[in-house]
């Protein structure tokens, strides 16, 4: 393909033919090779094959083992053959030596991982994968590494199998990413500079900087500088070719005099040195006298003579004055003790001056004589490095004990400065260092350990769990169940091992609380759930029936008074014992009492008298002796009772009337008998057969068929003993207070430390008549009188226990830095046990506070500067050769002493000021000794004050001094102005809000409880609060100032509302429903309805019903007694004979009776109820048809009950019932069968029974409980095999197993509301100044919500803005241009100032310069650097030099990313230096431009894209732009660069035609192209647009206007710029052509035709009219009701 693409014309064709021939040849050779292989493979081959190596075997670990493998001969097709078929010489070995690995080798061998190699593109490994033409995100690659098993100790390689035994071999390859090459990105060029020369040939340049370095093999950075020549004009005269160049200042040297003195003293002995010093001193004094004499003679002015006379007078002062002056000087020297740290020696330094040609070569100095030579010397301070002393010994370790937690102390050592650096000497090293330490030596005690302690838990409170609408809030007495209790946690010093038991809660043993910060562990919980046992109410059974009249005491029957008693039992174990139960016995006085009586068990069969077969007879009673409680006793006890007599009866003869047995006595009509009421009982019997005429016993009349007797004849006066509550337990002094005595005194009581003594309790017992009140005690049975006194246990007294007072809190500081607020210190003690049972009360005072002692002012430090010394000049011997120099005047250097002072003016060590007083003042400064011709002026005065703001001016002045007043040159006010004027400041301020509104904050101390109750969960803050917005104040120059300038306190306040939480509101519980079953186990239900959903963080609703989301159910099982409602049948009515034999009164007949459903009671059925309450299947018959026996017929009793079917039910089993003959038949007749049988059929008359267990009920709590421990129940149900529930007795009679637990405890989760701590104090402002400062306060979750408790608020922190304060800071000005004083080029200085700036701290505000006084409180640092540098050396290039610019600022940090996704190669930033030159001929001598990069953090992602400008003719601008809007060079892919030039061939010369970007002629906007047949533009025609007139148009004609959006050209057809019509409707003049009108007319005619035909086809033919018939029905009009079916 490459060959074909490079060969043009015929070359391409011949190459294609050769390629075809080559492929044919390959195909031929391939077929030949296949044929050859086929021939060769016809002969079978045999090869050796091997299996895997087996396990290494050996007697010892390590080398020397052996392993084997299987070797066999196989055919090439895979089947095994004999060994002889394979070449024996090629047989592989089946055994080899190996290394036997043991477990302990794991410590000796390990994998050694090599470094990853360079990332290699996948395309290089896979030759078939082409590399992408355009790199987008990078190229996938693979990198490898070497991995081998080595011996750990010496790194010797070992077999990989050893390491693989323990761990698989790590991977050898991994995927990697080769990032796309990143070209260097540079900024736009700066504007061209001015010409480097004012005349002649010069240079202009423009610069750019590097924004992103080349990465990953990207193209290098282009030139950062562009030059072009310039020539402003011809130079007049000869152009200067030479320039003076100054070199750098040399090393500071001592003056020759000092040097000679120092050198001489070093060689001369001490005595000679002393003599020499005396001689020099005499010479100096003589020299001074000569100089003073000369000066005296030279003095001309009167003022100098006056000063000289003053000095002479001073010399003549008295001795006392001289002594005072001497002491003052001594004191000053002592105050200037800092002088010993600075050995300031003023020396001099020189520099070299050369003359250079503009070509860069050095010339003779004479070539630069036309220029003034600069000064080559200056005074300086001889450089000395910092000198420090040796380190002091380490201080004692700050920790004096052994810390069990391993924490260490600190120890420090220091060194002193002996010589501070001067003259640019080396700075001082660190003067203090510290290190962690532990105390050394023996007998070091362990450190004090602090532990958390807690008070006892408070009483359990249930009220805090009540919801808002709980009705129990109004009456909280008796609440029980789950609750919450709290305690206080405090920190104490843990007791030492030698101390006694301090854990007990004794007053003297309680530990002193300390600061909580000393305890390191997690503090104990301060809240926990608790449980108050709910009182178990006493449950009693129903009253039993009234017993017989019995003696009060059967042992004493002397009195004739007796009582009838009824009793009830206690059904449970009530709280507090049975003493709180209601009375269990009621008594009624009666007459003729007896303790024992005969009970008639039954009457025997009727035996006729005189051994007859029928007729009158007697029934003997069967009796048993019973006591008053109905219990069977010995018959001898009833010897005094009246034995029941035999009862008269009659055995009916065949002709006698037959009566049924008497029914049972009915219930007594009244429970007692009185004046107006008497109890009656009835019983009845019926006629079963009539007598036979005259021969038999006649049937009685109807009145004889019923009997009535009196019952409950006792009076209606019921008495019982009523007990009052037990009184207070009073100590019984007769019983000793020992535990054993307690156990004896109160039987059944376990020994408990909580009880200390035995007491007695009494209660009131009275006799009460029901419904009347108290009566005399004799009315009640004395034997049943409850006890009035009982022993009791007295609980031990428990005193209040408090901790000792804590130590006084330390005063906030030992000194006051300002402010008059008195500091306070406090101490507290904590109640750890509340008093109980009459113990000692707690003290009232638990917190004490007192003022701190008056503290002194904090000992601050400050630098004190002393007077400047005289100005020292460079020695005259050095200066005398310099032109214009004078011996006594010129520039010099002066020094001063600096000392350290306390703020109270006392002296202090210099080290204190170095540490606390900020930077040290300057020690030296340049000075000028004025020469005679110099002008001398005073310093500027302060500006005068302004009378008012914004009015007038203010001035400052200075004056000439000395002879300068007389010199004319000094009177030139332009050179030496004596006054300056400026306008008075005009301060105008305006305030405006800034920032967001704060959170809504309640006023301090405002906590609203819900519903007026301050209980748990109700301490939510809600109600009206305020939110704040900061105010900012600006002056007239829009500079930030203090808010007080705007008369503002810094905030805008606005009222706001914090909504109070509202809990879920449910209705009260409904009444329990009736049990779902009338027999057996069912369920009963009660419910609550949702009244209001929670909002604003209130308690959530409990789980609602899944069907109806607005209801809460509670379901419990219930048991209905199957015998509580019974059918009661009245006696059968008289027979109604249907076929009456008037003679015999017998035959077929009907009997009826009433059957009623009645409620069953202890005494029997009582009140009738609705029939549906009784089981309809068990309802007795209300009518029966039968045959009334005729005389002499056999009369049988009614059928008895059916016998039970044997279980299990079986069709082979039967049941039967029987009847007995009451009247024997005559001899001619027989009795029918007296038994009846039927087959036992399952679920018909035979049933199986089984227990069924109900589901557990919901957890049931006491009505006084909210949550906590409750109980759940379930019940047994006896179920018949036909699924009908029956009485439990059916299952119990069968002895079925009951293996289920009917009751179980359960827990209802307590709805614990979230508990939050109080708000903390407001924090410090997050910013010390600026607009963004915030104050925060926080609270924490003390108790998370549980169950349906109120959830925690999401607002755990609040903020409000800080008052806005201006941000003041010191900033540098820009460096001044480099200036080499006195020369055109060379070494010079540049300067900058440090000024005070104000900003808003946002970083977006550049800041404004303000008075330096506003930064007076700030340490003079710039960007954290305390070393202020206001001048530095620099180089001014000479005209013949080419040099590098200063480094640019570091570029913004930039990430390597694509489309905003970080590629993971880090961030980088770059800076660069460009090349500058001033002479064109020196460009070849320029150095290389430089750039350097460094990694950075928090880089930004930038995208680059091409931007284009509008076409101007055939060209347009194309540039690359970064995503932040910066125009750059590089960064955009060159393959996607848009074209910047376009041209069409042939040229587009048609009107309104343009050359498109595709190089094809097109039309301007609003015009369409008309093309020739060969695709060339013929003309540009206006596109017609139909304009529809609107109501506001005055003209309604159709206009043809230019289109606003003409059809854009498409690239569908080559050679055409866009789509055009084949038939053009417009002519060359823009009007419609004639054929267009014809087409329109034809279309209109066709439309009219289609409409007409459609009308005719759809029109229905007209029907003939008929006469309407009068009897025709009118249609029914139906009203539409909205139903869709209508």
From Swiss-Prot:
Extensively N-glycosylated. Disulfide bonds join 460-530, 480-534, 491-519, 657-699, 668-672, 711-716, 729-792, 756-796, 767-780, 800-842, 811-815, 852-858, 1000-1056, 1022-1060, 1033-1046, 1064-1101, 1075-1079, 1118-1122, 1240-1246, 1259-1306, 1267-1310, 1278-1291, 1314-1352, 1325-1329, 1362-1367, 1378-1434, 1385-1438, 1396-1415, 1442-1486, 1453-1457, 1496-1501. GO terms for biological process: actin cytoskeleton organization; angiogenesis; axon extension; blood vessel endothelial cell migration; glomerular filtration; glomerulus development; podocyte development; regulation of Notch signaling pathway. Its main location: membrane. Residues 257-321 are annotated as: Disordered. Residues 1657-1686 are cytoplasmic. It is found in: Cell membrane; Cell projection. PANTHER family: SPONDIN (PTHR11311), THROMBOSPONDIN TYPE-1 DOMAIN-CONTAINING PROTEIN 7A (PTHR11311:SF8). This is Thrombospondin type-1 domain-containing protein 7A. It comes from Danio rerio (Zebrafish). The gene is thsd7aa.
